[in-house]
């Protein structure tokens, strides 16, 4: 009986922990404001929605070595964020540009979870293979859980490192 009580307690605690986890989502848009005092970045998404995103010491940056200082009004960015409304927190921010984070759109041809790669066929018919990061793998996992895999339309946000295309963000 004592073991049953422990099991019930464990299951309840695990449920609370799972509920407390925030869903991660991707926002692509343009920086309209950077506030260094409140450590926030306002990003106007493609659909016109403005997201006030809190940055922390845990926030990582791609495409800029200056971190928050590298983001200016008018900068095109992609953001991994948690939370909604006034509680949006940036986990990773990518500055989009020819010498930083690049964008590729297409259709998923193949996903290899073991090798952490995805092959995407572009509109011109060429196939590109992307290695993906752990964070991007979570995007992939959420999309596959929602039924998206081979044949899904995808936008890949990537950098080129040592001759490889490294996907940091996926948007399905």
Regions found by a protein language model. Name each.
Residues 2-135, 140-172:
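Short, flexible, surface-exposed loop segments at domain boundaries
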């Amino acid at each position: 009986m004592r073991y049953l009580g422990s099991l019930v307690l464990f299951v309840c605690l695990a449920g609370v922990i799972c509920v407390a986890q925030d869903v991660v989502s991707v926002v692509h848009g343009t920086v309209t404001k950077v506030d260094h005092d409140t450590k926030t970045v306002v990003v106007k998404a493609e659909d016109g929605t403005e997201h006030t995103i809190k940055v922390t010491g845990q926030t990582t940056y791609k495409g800029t070595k200056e971190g928050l200082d590298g983001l200016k009004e008018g900068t095109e960015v992609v953001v991994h964020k948690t939370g909604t409304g006034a509680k949006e927190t940036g986990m990773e921010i990518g500055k989009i540009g020819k010498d930083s984070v690049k964008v590729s759109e297409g259709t998923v041809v193949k996903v290899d979870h073991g090798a952490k790669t995805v092959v995407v066929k572009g509109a011109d018919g060429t196939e590109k293979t992307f290695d993906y990061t752990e964070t991007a793998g979570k995007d992939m996992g959420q999309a596959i859980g929602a039924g998206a895999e081979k044949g899904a339309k995808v936008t890949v946000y990537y950098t080129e490192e040592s001759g490889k295309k490294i996907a940091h963000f996926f948007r399905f």
